[in-house]
Amino acid sequence: MMTGGDTGRLPSKGIGIVGYGQSKYAKHTDRTLLSLLAEAARAAMDKAELTKSALDGIAVCSFDLPPDNAVTLAEQFGMSVSWAYLGTAGGAGPVASVINAIRAIEAGHASVVLCLAGDAYDVAGHYRMMDNFNRALRNYGAPNGFGGANGLFGIIQRKHMETYGTRRDQLGRIAVGQRASATLNENALFRSPLTLEEYLNARLIADPIRLYDCVMPCSGAEAVVVAPLDRAPSGRGVRVLAGYERHNHPVGEIAPLRGGWELFREALYRDAGYGPPEMDFVQAYDDYPIMVAIQLEDLGFCPKGEVGRFLAMHSFSFDGSLPLNTNGGQLSCGQAGAGGGMIGLVEAVCQLRHEAGPRQVKGGRRGLVSGYGMVGYGHGLSASCVILERGAA
């Protein structure tokens, strides 16, 4: 698939991620969103060895934040900023926020940017959010019995299975492999091992999607600090080699088996100087295993329609042949609203700093992080991706 040219190319590889942090995840909590975001922000600044006074930019992605926004969050954090960004791309927004923070720094609008993502709600809060997600869903989906993302992705998975012969036992290898990594992650909501038999026999949710295809809505927050790499603690900066975003592709297609990644993947790998074989891990947006599979196809890890065979050939735990969502991903950690779009980014930085402890990918040098979001009437509207590389020791 040809790309749309150089549109979106990052201007510099001298800017990257110098710190990362995560709040405690919880299925139920009485904590406020502000406290969760603050916990993640403090952790990220500690990792960056920076104080609040060094920050002059802020980016935030959250469904639960309105009527507050990035500017009011800066006020609540006691920050004076020259650049503020409010993400609007759902699960693709956090990766896009880092891309735009790099552009802002390169343009001189900021020097150090705190990027945040998270939400504070349970299952009931998740459904309240979906009721007001966008006008298309409210006006056209809900009156016709559309009950949210499970129904749409059930259609997409069925379509993929019937079009290409993809099987549930192949898709299940994603959930099982990620759960194996989650058993070593103290912040994952689900840490018990998951067998393929348990995956296949779980209760039906939206045919053919079953229980372990779905994420658990939860509360939590993630943060990264974006800055010139010479601001990073010695040897612990993470380069952003390339990054792209795309919105509303394919135009007008209902339940598509592709997304915006296919339009920019050639430019992504060209800019990075590396392709899929050189990725030591992949942190893919995993609201459902079928979407991970589609991302692997669209990002060129296997030809379109052959992901079932690809999945059958690989193992996906942190020590597998293709380490995938090495903290367990949203399928095991939970989906903290918009934080689900940053959980993979934070894990990637952790891996590249070789700070992942027992789930460390051996010799991890570079990896890919993708985002996907704004699932409304017929398809997700937004796709994003970055390629990261470990800094010099």
Predicted features by range, described:
Residues M2-A92, N100, H160-Q170, L189-E198, ...:
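Conserved active-site "lid/cap" helical segment
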Residues R9-P11, S62-L116, A120-L152, F190-C214, ...:
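Conserved catalytic cysteine-centered active-site region
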Residues L65-A74, G252-P256, D286-R309, G320, ...:
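Short glycine/threonine-rich loop-to-helix capping motif typified by GTGT followed
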Residues A89-D119, G151-L184, V224-D230, Q335-A356:
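Active-site-proximal alpha-helical scaffold in enzymes
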Residues M2-L34, T163, R173, L204-A267, ...:
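Condensing-enzyme catalytic core mediating Claisen C-C bond formation in acyl metabolism
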Residues Q22-K24, S62-L65, G90-G93, A117-D122, ...:
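Acidic, glycine-rich active-site loops and adjacent beta-strand->loop/helix elements
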Residues E266-P289, D298-F301, Q330-A336:
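Extended C-terminal subregions enriched in glycine
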Residues K52-C61, A84-L86, V113-G118, D169-V176, ...:
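Beta-strand segments within the central parallel beta-sheet cores of soluble alpha/beta enzyme folds
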